[in-house]
Every structure is written in C-alpha cells, then in structure tokens.
Amino acid sequence: MRADEILELVNGPAVLDIGCAGHEVKPDQPGWLHGKLRERFQVTGIDISESNIAHMKSLGIQDIHVQSADSFELGRQYDTVVAGEVIEHLSNPGQFLARVRKHLVPDGRLVLSTPYGFSLMYALYAANYFPKTCANGEHACWFCPTTIRELARREGFEVEKWRLIDDYDPSVTSRKYRLYWKLIHTLGKLLPDKLTKTTMLIAFKCLS
C-alpha cells in the first residue's frame, strides 16, 4: 500500500502532512495516510478542503488547518513534510517546493508521491479514453523521474531515494478499475517496474 511505503521514509518526531484529507476522509480505511502518520508521529495537517477539515475536526482530529499547498504558512519547521498525491494538482509546483523548504528543519526531508505518467496503466487508459488521458480531472500536470528531479534541484532539493510503486486502492469497487489492476498485476510478472508501476515515491533533502 502507498501509505506504508511512504511511512518507511518519514523521519520524526514532527511531521507536516500536506493534503491531509486525501481524496476523502477515510479513518476506517487501513490505507488512509494521515491516520497512519498520527499513529507514529506528532503531526500537523493542512488541506485546501474546508469541508474535509471540518469533518476531520468533528472526528476529534487536532492540529489541522485549511491552507493551500502552494501558499501555506504555519510559523514552524518540521523534520519531515509529506505530500502524497498533491503536486500534480498544483498551478505552481515550484512555489509549493519553496514553501516546503521554508518549513523544514536543516537536513529535513520531503517525502512526495505522484503518478508516474509513463506507466503502462496510464497508457492503456489514454488509449481507451483519448484525448482524455487522466481519470482525475483536477490533475494539472504529469511528472517523470527527470522532470521531478530537475524541478526539485531548482528549488534547493536533491533526491535521496526514489522508487516506483503500485497504488492499488482495495476500497474502490469499480469493476473496470479492478480489471485494469488485474491486467497490470499479470503484466507486472513479465515486464519491468518502469512499465507496470504507477506511482513515483521520492524522498528529497534540502541542499545546503
């Protein structure tokens, strides 16, 4: 699960979770990243959705705030900033990275995941629905290892670790979604990860 892969890269104790609600607030789901982070670390969360933050507060979740990922200001620094499936939604990814850097302690870490646009799954989706190439209409851009590395370098980060992972969500009941994943899983036994994995997971550190 993506959340478990992200957790392996997080250093504490202080963690900022950007986009903390996820697509939906799912505290009862094992893959809900914000819940997993709170089990291990001292976590602050921000999300642009007022309704999702209100819902989370109604569940007793504290230290969460309605703020935008590319303009947030919290007045403190963190050991790790986590941004799971956020950067592809933003109008200004570079400005987002600049805000993250301001909120990291020296030698702090940014852990980021984003769809890998050259995955076979996305190629199959595009072939089926072209000119629509992405199921999520709120995505504004695609990244690959080269482009995300260069963008990060321009904003004062360097890559510490990266890998390609799967992002299968067992809570999705769509028959077509599950058929896609069954096909990808089968092909994954025959083809390299660079063709079958769907998500990039990267840990960055601040350049001195």
What are these regions (language model features)?
Residues 14, 42, 77-79, 109:
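Structural signature of beta-strand start/N-cap positions in the alpha/beta core
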Residues 20, 70, 91-208:
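S-adenosyl-L-methionine-dependent methyltransferase catalytic module, highlighting the catalytic core
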Residues 21-72:
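Class I SAM-dependent methyltransferase SAM/SAH-binding core
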